[in-house]
Amino acid sequence: MTEELKSAIERAAAALKAFGAREVYVFGSAATGTMDEYSDVDLAVSGLPPEVFYRAMGKAGDILQRPLDLVDLDDDNPFIRYLKEEKELVRVA
């Protein structure tokens, strides 16, 4: 991951926290170091109020300037459980 992208992820995480997220994590290729120029950025949040989720996602995407996959860790579904159980999450903020 380039320093520029790392900085953008940190700024996106700060924006998500400004919208009310308690915690922000990165996962996927950005977390494992296998990201390339075509990769999206996978972020996970907890505590982000549902009424601002998509607005916050748009702001983070604008900062990143690449596709963003934002997941809510407060949801209870198999994918979220997998991320938590397999320790796939790297805390950003």
Task: Give residue ranges: language-model regions.
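Catalytic core of pol beta-like nucleotidyltransferases
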Residues: 1-23, 31-37, 48-93
